[in-house]
Protein backbone atom coordinates (compact mmCIF):
# COMPACT_ATOMS: atom_id res chain seq x y z
CA UNK A 1 0.00 0.00 0.00
CA UNK A 2 1.32 3.48 -0.84
CA UNK A 3 2.22 6.16 1.70
CA UNK A 4 -1.05 7.88 0.83
CA UNK A 5 -3.06 4.97 2.16
CA UNK A 6 -5.01 5.46 5.33
CA UNK A 7 -3.29 3.65 8.18
CA UNK A 8 -5.80 3.96 11.01
CA UNK A 9 -9.05 2.07 10.53
CA UNK A 10 -10.66 4.15 13.28
CA UNK A 11 -10.10 7.37 11.32
CA UNK A 12 -11.72 6.14 8.11
CA UNK A 13 -15.06 7.55 7.00
CA UNK A 14 -16.09 5.58 3.94
CA UNK A 15 -18.56 8.17 2.66
CA UNK A 16 -15.64 10.58 2.14
CA UNK A 17 -14.25 8.22 -0.51
CA UNK A 18 -17.29 8.20 -2.79
CA UNK A 19 -19.08 10.82 -4.86
CA UNK A 20 -22.47 9.15 -4.34
CA UNK A 21 -24.19 7.09 -1.70
CA UNK A 22 -26.20 3.87 -1.81
CA UNK A 23 -29.00 3.63 -4.33
CA UNK A 24 -28.66 7.38 -4.85
CA UNK A 25 -25.76 6.38 -7.15
CA UNK A 26 -28.19 4.83 -9.62
CA UNK A 27 -28.18 6.18 -13.15
CA UNK A 28 -31.37 8.16 -13.72
CA UNK A 29 -34.32 6.40 -15.41
CA UNK A 30 -34.08 8.68 -18.45
CA UNK A 31 -30.37 7.98 -19.04
CA UNK A 32 -30.89 4.28 -18.33
CA UNK A 33 -33.54 4.11 -21.06
CA UNK A 34 -30.96 5.37 -23.56
CA UNK A 35 -28.34 2.88 -22.38
CA UNK A 36 -30.71 -0.09 -22.71
CA UNK A 37 -31.98 0.90 -26.17
CA UNK A 38 -29.95 -1.77 -27.99
CA UNK A 39 -29.63 -1.70 -31.78
CA UNK A 40 -28.97 -5.43 -31.92
CA UNK A 41 -31.57 -7.95 -33.09
CA UNK A 42 -33.81 -9.14 -30.26
CA UNK A 43 -32.90 -12.60 -29.00
CA UNK A 44 -35.76 -14.41 -27.30
CA UNK A 45 -35.99 -17.43 -25.04
CA UNK A 46 -39.46 -18.76 -24.19
CA UNK A 47 -38.22 -19.84 -20.77
CA UNK A 48 -37.18 -16.30 -19.81
CA UNK A 49 -40.35 -15.22 -18.04
CA UNK A 50 -39.10 -11.84 -16.84
CA UNK A 51 -36.25 -10.00 -18.56
CA UNK A 52 -35.25 -6.49 -19.52
CA UNK A 53 -38.32 -6.01 -21.71
CA UNK A 54 -39.96 -4.84 -18.49
CA UNK A 55 -38.57 -2.74 -15.67
CA UNK A 56 -38.85 -5.40 -13.01
CA UNK A 57 -36.63 -6.09 -10.02
CA UNK A 58 -34.97 -9.28 -11.28
CA UNK A 59 -34.85 -11.76 -14.14
CA UNK A 60 -36.84 -14.98 -13.85
CA UNK A 61 -36.07 -18.14 -15.83
CA UNK A 62 -38.50 -21.05 -16.02
CA UNK A 63 -36.70 -24.16 -14.80
CA UNK A 64 -39.70 -26.46 -15.17
CA UNK A 65 -43.48 -26.19 -14.99
CA UNK A 66 -43.38 -25.45 -11.27
CA UNK A 67 -40.13 -23.66 -10.40
CA UNK A 68 -38.38 -20.56 -11.68
CA UNK A 69 -34.86 -19.30 -11.01
CA UNK A 70 -34.48 -15.63 -10.05
CA UNK A 71 -31.28 -13.75 -10.86
CA UNK A 72 -30.37 -10.22 -9.79
CA UNK A 73 -27.43 -7.99 -8.97
CA UNK A 74 -27.06 -4.75 -7.06
CA UNK A 75 -24.05 -2.79 -5.84
CA UNK A 76 -23.20 0.76 -4.85
CA UNK A 77 -20.80 3.11 -3.08
CA UNK A 78 -20.80 3.65 0.71
CA UNK A 79 -23.91 5.13 2.25
CA UNK A 80 -22.54 4.93 5.82
CA UNK A 81 -19.04 5.31 7.25
CA UNK A 82 -18.82 2.03 9.15
CA UNK A 83 -17.43 -0.71 6.84
CA UNK A 84 -19.33 -3.64 8.37
CA UNK A 85 -22.62 -1.73 8.27
CA UNK A 86 -22.00 -0.67 4.67
CA UNK A 87 -21.52 -4.29 3.64
CA UNK A 88 -24.60 -5.39 5.53
CA UNK A 89 -26.77 -2.69 3.94
CA UNK A 90 -25.49 -3.35 0.43
CA UNK A 91 -26.16 -7.07 0.76
CA UNK A 92 -29.60 -6.58 2.31
CA UNK A 93 -30.49 -4.28 -0.57
CA UNK A 94 -29.32 -6.78 -3.19
CA UNK A 95 -31.19 -9.70 -1.64
CA UNK A 96 -34.37 -7.59 -1.56
CA UNK A 97 -34.90 -7.99 -5.30
CA UNK A 98 -35.44 -11.72 -4.79
CA UNK A 99 -38.11 -11.06 -2.17
CA UNK A 100 -39.69 -8.39 -4.37
CA UNK A 101 -40.42 -11.06 -6.98
CA UNK A 102 -41.98 -13.26 -4.29
CA UNK A 103 -39.04 -15.65 -4.18
CA UNK A 104 -36.55 -16.95 -1.65
CA UNK A 105 -32.77 -16.49 -2.01
CA UNK A 106 -30.50 -19.49 -2.53
CA UNK A 107 -26.94 -18.10 -2.65
CA UNK A 108 -24.98 -14.94 -3.34
CA UNK A 109 -21.75 -13.89 -5.04
CA UNK A 110 -19.91 -10.77 -3.83
CA UNK A 111 -18.99 -7.82 -6.07
CA UNK A 112 -16.16 -5.66 -4.68
CA UNK A 113 -14.39 -2.62 -6.08
CA UNK A 114 -11.68 -1.27 -3.80
CA UNK A 115 -9.16 1.61 -3.97
CA UNK A 116 -6.27 -0.57 -2.77
CA UNK A 117 -3.79 2.32 -2.67
CA UNK A 118 -6.08 4.48 -0.55
CA UNK A 119 -7.87 2.14 1.86
CA UNK A 120 -6.49 -0.86 3.78
CA UNK A 121 -7.55 -4.35 2.75
CA UNK A 122 -8.63 -4.92 6.35
CA UNK A 123 -11.42 -2.39 5.82
CA UNK A 124 -12.59 -4.26 2.73
CA UNK A 125 -12.61 -7.43 4.81
CA UNK A 126 -15.02 -5.77 7.24
CA UNK A 127 -17.26 -4.73 4.34
CA UNK A 128 -17.37 -8.29 3.03
CA UNK A 129 -18.07 -9.58 6.54
CA UNK A 130 -21.04 -7.23 6.74
CA UNK A 131 -22.32 -8.72 3.50
CA UNK A 132 -21.75 -12.20 4.89
CA UNK A 133 -23.77 -11.28 8.00
CA UNK A 134 -26.74 -10.18 5.87
CA UNK A 135 -26.53 -13.40 3.88
CA UNK A 136 -26.55 -15.42 7.09
CA UNK A 137 -29.65 -13.54 8.24
CA UNK A 138 -31.29 -14.44 4.93
CA UNK A 139 -30.28 -18.08 5.37
CA UNK A 140 -27.90 -18.24 2.41
CA UNK A 141 -24.18 -18.63 1.75
CA UNK A 142 -21.90 -15.95 0.38
CA UNK A 143 -20.49 -18.47 -2.04
CA UNK A 144 -17.78 -16.49 -3.84
CA UNK A 145 -17.21 -13.25 -5.63
CA UNK A 146 -15.06 -11.02 -7.80
CA UNK A 147 -12.97 -7.95 -6.95
CA UNK A 148 -11.20 -5.17 -8.84
CA UNK A 149 -8.99 -2.21 -8.00
CA UNK A 150 -11.34 0.77 -8.32
CA UNK A 151 -11.12 4.53 -7.65
CA UNK A 152 -13.99 4.38 -5.12
CA UNK A 153 -15.26 1.66 -2.77
CA UNK A 154 -18.06 -0.41 -4.29
CA UNK A 155 -19.81 -3.42 -2.81
CA UNK A 156 -22.85 -5.53 -3.59
CA UNK A 157 -24.06 -8.97 -4.54
CA UNK A 158 -25.26 -11.07 -7.40
CA UNK A 159 -28.04 -13.18 -5.90
CA UNK A 160 -29.75 -16.33 -7.13
CA UNK A 161 -33.17 -17.30 -5.83
CA UNK A 162 -36.07 -19.57 -6.60
CA UNK A 163 -39.80 -19.09 -6.93
CA UNK A 164 -42.84 -21.29 -7.24
CA UNK A 165 -44.26 -20.01 -10.52
CA UNK A 166 -47.72 -19.78 -8.99
CA UNK A 167 -46.29 -17.24 -6.50
CA UNK A 168 -44.36 -15.11 -9.01
CA UNK A 169 -45.13 -11.42 -8.59
CA UNK A 170 -44.17 -8.65 -11.00
CA UNK A 171 -44.33 -4.87 -10.91
CA UNK A 172 -46.49 -4.43 -14.02
CA UNK A 173 -49.43 -6.71 -13.23
CA UNK A 174 -51.52 -4.54 -10.90
CA UNK A 175 -55.27 -4.23 -11.47
CA UNK A 176 -57.77 -1.41 -11.24
CA UNK A 177 -59.15 -0.90 -7.71
CA UNK A 178 -56.06 -2.45 -6.09
CA UNK A 179 -55.01 -0.88 -2.81
CA UNK A 180 -51.39 0.24 -2.35
CA UNK A 181 -49.40 -0.68 0.77
CA UNK A 182 -45.85 0.29 1.76
CA UNK A 183 -43.86 -1.76 4.29
CA UNK A 184 -41.09 0.71 5.26
CA UNK A 185 -41.05 4.46 5.86
CA UNK A 186 -39.55 6.92 3.36
CA UNK A 187 -36.66 9.27 4.14
CA UNK A 188 -33.48 7.21 3.91
CA UNK A 189 -31.96 9.54 1.32
CA UNK A 190 -32.67 12.56 3.50
CA UNK A 191 -31.08 11.07 6.63
CA UNK A 192 -28.02 9.68 4.86
CA UNK A 193 -27.49 13.05 3.19
CA UNK A 194 -27.64 14.64 6.64
CA UNK A 195 -24.82 12.32 7.63
CA UNK A 196 -22.77 13.22 4.56
CA UNK A 197 -23.32 16.92 5.32
CA UNK A 198 -22.25 16.28 8.95
CA UNK A 199 -25.62 17.47 10.25
CA UNK A 200 -26.85 14.12 11.58
CA UNK A 201 -27.07 14.05 15.36
CA UNK A 202 -25.53 11.09 17.18
CA UNK A 203 -28.90 10.08 18.63
CA UNK A 204 -30.33 9.84 15.09
CA UNK A 205 -27.47 7.83 13.59
CA UNK A 206 -29.24 4.47 13.74
CA UNK A 207 -32.65 5.50 12.37
CA UNK A 208 -31.83 4.97 8.70
CA UNK A 209 -29.35 2.17 9.42
CA UNK A 210 -31.97 0.08 11.21
CA UNK A 211 -34.40 0.51 8.31
CA UNK A 212 -31.79 -0.36 5.68
CA UNK A 213 -30.65 -3.49 7.53
CA UNK A 214 -34.20 -4.88 7.73
CA UNK A 215 -34.61 -7.73 5.25
CA UNK A 216 -37.69 -7.68 3.02
CA UNK A 217 -38.17 -11.41 3.60
CA UNK A 218 -41.88 -10.78 4.19
CA UNK A 219 -42.12 -10.55 0.39
CA UNK A 220 -41.98 -14.33 0.04
CA UNK A 221 -45.02 -14.61 2.31
CA UNK A 222 -46.88 -11.71 0.70
CA UNK A 223 -46.50 -13.45 -2.67
CA UNK A 224 -48.54 -16.41 -1.47
CA UNK A 225 -51.60 -14.18 -1.11
CA UNK A 226 -53.51 -14.74 -4.34
CA UNK A 227 -55.03 -11.28 -4.31
CA UNK A 228 -51.64 -9.56 -4.35
CA UNK A 229 -51.46 -8.52 -7.98
CA UNK A 230 -48.15 -6.65 -8.08
CA UNK A 231 -45.07 -6.32 -5.92
CA UNK A 232 -41.85 -4.29 -6.10
CA UNK A 233 -39.32 -2.70 -3.78
CA UNK A 234 -38.77 1.02 -3.42
CA UNK A 235 -35.11 1.90 -3.98
CA UNK A 236 -33.08 4.47 -5.89
CA UNK A 237 -35.84 5.91 -8.08
CA UNK A 238 -37.85 6.88 -5.00
CA UNK A 239 -41.46 6.10 -4.16
CA UNK A 240 -42.74 8.12 -7.13
CA UNK A 241 -40.41 6.42 -9.60
CA UNK A 242 -41.27 2.89 -8.57
CA UNK A 243 -44.97 3.72 -8.33
CA UNK A 244 -44.78 5.05 -11.89
CA UNK A 245 -43.32 1.72 -13.02
CA UNK A 246 -46.33 -0.03 -11.48
CA UNK A 247 -48.79 2.38 -13.10
CA UNK A 248 -47.20 2.53 -16.54
CA UNK A 249 -46.68 -1.22 -16.70
CA UNK A 250 -50.35 -1.91 -15.93
CA UNK A 251 -51.71 1.20 -17.71
CA UNK A 252 -53.34 2.50 -14.52
CA UNK A 253 -53.45 5.72 -12.52
CA UNK A 254 -52.46 5.86 -8.86
CA UNK A 255 -54.45 7.94 -6.39
CA UNK A 256 -51.77 8.67 -3.80
CA UNK A 257 -52.53 9.94 -0.31
CA UNK A 258 -49.32 11.80 0.43
CA UNK A 259 -50.35 12.39 4.05
CA UNK A 260 -50.48 8.62 4.56
CA UNK A 261 -46.94 7.98 3.27
CA UNK A 262 -44.90 6.95 6.34
CA UNK A 263 -41.70 8.90 7.05
CA UNK A 264 -38.70 7.93 9.13
CA UNK A 265 -38.43 9.78 12.45
CA UNK A 266 -36.65 13.15 12.10
CA UNK A 267 -36.74 13.02 8.29
CA UNK A 268 -38.77 16.24 8.11
CA UNK A 269 -36.38 18.01 10.50
CA UNK A 270 -33.38 17.24 8.30
CA UNK A 271 -35.33 18.05 5.16
CA UNK A 272 -35.95 21.51 6.62
CA UNK A 273 -32.16 21.84 6.99
CA UNK A 274 -31.69 21.28 3.26
CA UNK A 275 -30.60 17.63 3.41
CA UNK A 276 -31.76 16.68 -0.07
CA UNK A 277 -29.66 14.15 -2.02
CA UNK A 278 -28.66 14.83 -5.61
CA UNK A 279 -30.57 11.71 -6.60
CA UNK A 280 -33.83 13.44 -5.68
CA UNK A 281 -33.30 16.08 -8.35
CA UNK A 282 -32.16 13.51 -10.94
CA UNK A 283 -35.24 11.44 -10.24
CA UNK A 284 -37.62 14.36 -10.67
CA UNK A 285 -35.86 15.51 -13.83
CA UNK A 286 -36.31 12.00 -15.25
CA UNK A 287 -40.00 11.43 -14.55
CA UNK A 288 -41.48 14.64 -13.16
CA UNK A 289 -43.51 15.16 -16.34
CA UNK A 290 -45.61 12.12 -15.34
CA UNK A 291 -46.39 13.51 -11.88
CA UNK A 292 -48.93 16.11 -10.81
CA UNK A 293 -47.73 19.59 -9.88
CA UNK A 294 -45.71 19.20 -6.68
CA UNK A 295 -44.28 21.59 -4.14
CA UNK A 296 -40.55 21.36 -3.42
CA UNK A 297 -41.45 19.66 -0.14
CA UNK A 298 -43.55 17.02 -1.91
CA UNK A 299 -40.80 16.41 -4.50
CA UNK A 300 -38.26 15.90 -1.73
CA UNK A 301 -40.38 13.14 -0.21
CA UNK A 302 -41.72 11.37 -3.29
CA UNK A 303 -38.43 11.44 -5.22
CA UNK A 304 -36.14 10.72 -2.26
CA UNK A 305 -33.89 7.80 -3.31
CA UNK A 306 -34.23 4.87 -0.94
CA UNK A 307 -31.54 2.31 -0.23
CA UNK A 308 -32.86 -1.06 0.90
CA UNK A 309 -36.33 0.46 1.02
CA UNK A 310 -39.60 -1.29 1.67
CA UNK A 311 -42.00 -3.23 -0.52
CA UNK A 312 -44.78 -1.58 -2.49
CA UNK A 313 -47.76 -3.94 -2.68
CA UNK A 314 -50.82 -3.74 -4.93
CA UNK A 315 -53.57 -5.90 -3.43
CA UNK A 316 -57.22 -6.45 -4.30
CA UNK A 317 -59.85 -5.26 -1.85
CA UNK A 318 -60.90 -8.89 -1.35
CA UNK A 319 -57.40 -9.88 -0.16
CA UNK A 320 -56.62 -6.67 1.73
CA UNK A 321 -57.59 -8.07 5.14
CA UNK A 322 -55.33 -11.08 4.61
CA UNK A 323 -52.39 -8.81 3.78
CA UNK A 324 -53.04 -6.61 6.81
CA UNK A 325 -53.19 -9.66 9.08
CA UNK A 326 -49.90 -10.98 7.67
CA UNK A 327 -48.11 -7.67 8.16
CA UNK A 328 -49.43 -7.31 11.69
CA UNK A 329 -48.30 -10.85 12.52
CA UNK A 330 -44.75 -9.89 11.51
CA UNK A 331 -44.73 -6.58 13.41
CA UNK A 332 -44.91 -4.52 10.20
CA UNK A 333 -47.37 -1.65 10.38
CA UNK A 334 -49.86 -2.04 7.50
CA UNK A 335 -50.03 1.37 5.84
CA UNK A 336 -52.29 1.99 2.86
CA UNK A 337 -50.98 4.94 0.84
CA UNK A 338 -53.51 4.94 -2.00
CA UNK A 339 -55.20 2.94 -4.72
CA UNK A 340 -55.13 2.26 -8.44
CA UNK A 341 -57.84 3.08 -10.93
CA UNK A 342 -58.60 3.02 -14.63
CA UNK A 343 -57.12 6.18 -16.18
CA UNK A 344 -59.47 9.05 -16.97
CA UNK A 345 -56.65 11.31 -18.17
CA UNK A 346 -52.98 11.07 -19.15
CA UNK A 347 -51.87 11.43 -15.52
CA UNK A 348 -50.10 8.41 -14.03
CA UNK A 349 -50.29 9.69 -10.46
CA UNK A 350 -52.80 12.03 -8.82
CA UNK A 351 -52.79 13.24 -5.23
CA UNK A 352 -55.88 12.77 -3.12
UniProtKB/Swiss-Prot annotation:
One of its GO terms (cellular component) is cytoplasm. It catalyses: hydrogenselenide + ATP + H2O = selenophosphate + AMP + phosphate + 2 H(+). GO terms for biological process: selenocysteine biosynthetic process. It comes from the Bacteria. Keywords: ATP-binding, Kinase, Magnesium, Metal-binding, Nucleotide-binding, Selenium, Transferase. It is an enzyme of class 2 (transferase). The record marks 26 as: Important for catalytic activity. Its EC number is 2.7.9.3. Its cofactor is Mg(2+). Pfam families: AIRS (PF00586), AIRS_C (PF02769). GO terms for molecular function: ATP binding; magnesium ion binding; selenide, water dikinase activity. Belongs to the selenophosphate synthase 1 family. Class I subfamily. Synthesizes selenophosphate from selenide and ATP. NCBIfam families: PRK00943.1, selD. Homodimer. This is Selenide, water dikinase. It comes from Shewanella sp. (strain ANA-3).
Amino acid sequence: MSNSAVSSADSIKLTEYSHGAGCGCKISPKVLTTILASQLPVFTDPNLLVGNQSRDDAAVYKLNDEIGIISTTDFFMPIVDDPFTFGRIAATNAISDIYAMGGTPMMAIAILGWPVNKLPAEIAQQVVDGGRQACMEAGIMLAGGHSIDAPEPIFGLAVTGQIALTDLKQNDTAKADDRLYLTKPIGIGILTTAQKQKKLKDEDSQIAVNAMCQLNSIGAKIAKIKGVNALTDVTGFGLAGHLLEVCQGAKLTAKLNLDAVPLLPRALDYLAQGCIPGGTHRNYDSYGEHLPTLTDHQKAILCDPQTSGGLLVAVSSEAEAELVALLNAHQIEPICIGSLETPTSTANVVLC
